[in-house]
Amino acid sequence: MKKIASLLVAFSAIAAAGAALADPPAFVGRLSLVEGAASIRHAYDQQWVPGGINFPIIAGDGVWSDQGSRTEIEIGGSEARLDQISELDIERLDESGATLRVPQGVVNLTVRYLPPGGMQVMTSVGQFSIRRPGEYHIDAGRPGGPPTQLLLGVMSGEASFAGLRGAVELNSGQGVMVPPDQTSIQVVAVYPTPFDQWAETRAGQLAASQSMAYVSPEMTGYQDLDTYGQWQPTPDYGPVWFPSQVEIGWAPYRRGHWAYVQPWGWTWIDDAPWGFAPFHYGRWAEFDGRWGWIPGERHERPVYAPALVAFIGGEPGGDHVGWVPLGPREMFHPYYEHSDVYVINLNRGHFHDEGEIRRFDHAPPPGSDHFANRQAVTQVNAGAFSGGQPVHEHMTPGGPAPGPGNRPAPVIGDVGRLPPPPAQQRAQPAPSPAGAAQPGQPQPPQPHPQPTPGQAPAQLPRPMPTVPQVQPLPQTQIQQPRPVQPAPQPQQQQAPQQQKKEQKETPDHDHQAQH
C-alpha cells in the first residue's frame, strides 16, 4: 500500500507540474515602434508575417526590420532597436531574464533594469553578457555583403564577451571586434554612430517617464504613458492614468482589432502608441465621465493577459461577439489553458488575498449587468471579430443578446463559445530573411504590404552612414590590433516603393567597417 501511495503522490506531482507547464508566458515584449516595415516570425509556426505595433513578442519569436526601416521592441523596462535590414531573435524571455540573438544587421540595446537572470546577446562568434544597465551596440554585418568583423560596443554600462579565443571585460566606451574566422579578439574604443544617436534620443524621451513611480519596471509598455496621458491620485484606487488624446465617446477596447495569437488565442491589438500596458495589465474605470487606467499594486509582479475583458453574448456560434472592460476588483477568468496558480498570479494585484481570488474563480460567472463598466460594452459581428477588422468601424448597435428568460446576457466563460480561430491564423507570410536559417548566405526579404489595418507607417528615416568610429586601445587589447580604417561607403539599393521619394537624399545607410 505504501508503494501505491508513493506512486499516487508521484503522479500527482507530475500532473501538477504539467498544469504549470501549460500556463502561457507571464512576461512578454511588444513591438513598440515601426518606422517603415517590419516582420515577425512566430514561435509556434516559424513563419514570417507583417508586424504592427503592440503585437506581443515571446520566446522563440524573431523580428526583422526591413530595408529603409527602423524598429523598436520593448522588453519590460528595456528596449532593443533594430536598424534597417536587421534581425533579432528572442531565444529566452521570462521573469528571470532574456537571451537575444543577432544573426545579421545592427541592434542598439538600452537596458534600464537588469533582471536576476541577466541579459545575454548571442552572436555567431560568441556571447555578449550585459553586467549593468546601460546602452549597447551590436553590429553583426549586413546581409548579402562580404564577411565583416563583428563589433560589440558598450556605449555606457558594463559587459563581458566570451568567444573561441577567450573572454574580455568591457567598460563604457569599449568594444570588441572579432573576425569571422575568430582568430583574434581586438579591444577598441567605440563612439556612437548616427543610428546610436537616434536610438539614444528615443531612449532619452522614454527614460524621463514618471510612470516608473507607479508601475513595476517589469511591466512591458509603460514607457509611452507620460507622452499620451497624465497620472492623478484618487482616494479609492491610488494613482490612476488618464489618456489625453481620445475622441468623445471613446471607451477601452474599441480602437484596435482582435488577432489569434498562440498560446493565448484571441488577443487585443490596440491602435494607440500607448495601447499596450493599459490593455494587458490593470483595470479601467470611469471618473466623472473620463476613463482612467488603474495599474494595480506596484510591488506585485505584473502578469501579461491577452485582453482584460469579459466576453458576453448568447449561444455558441452566434452572429455577434461582445465584451466589457473589467473594472476594479473584477476577476479575469482566462479563456485559454491555465493552472490555478496562474489565475492567482494574474489577479493578485487587484484583490486583498489569494482566498478571495479562489472564491471568485470558482463562482459561477455573473451576467453582463453585474460589471461596473457595463455601459461600455462593445459588440461586433463574428466575421469582423475573427477577421481582425477595425472594431470601431464594425460596431453593431445595441448590446449583446439576452439570455434565456430575457435575463442579462451571460458571460462567455470558455473558449468554445468564442468564434473559432480563422482557418488561416496568420496573414500572408512575408518572404523570410534566409540568413537566419543559412548563416553566411543571408538574403533580405522583399518589401511587403503594411500590416495592421488602420495603421499608416511613419515617415521612413533618411539613410545615413554608420561606419563605427573605433580606435585601438593597446593597454587592454588581447592581440596586437591591426589599424582600423573606415571602409568606402557602397551604394545600397533602395526599397522599390521609396526609390522616387529618396533619390535626392543620402543614398547610403548604416554600414559596418571592414578589415
How should these model regions be labeled?
Residues 1-8:
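Bacterial N-terminal signal peptides that target proteins for export
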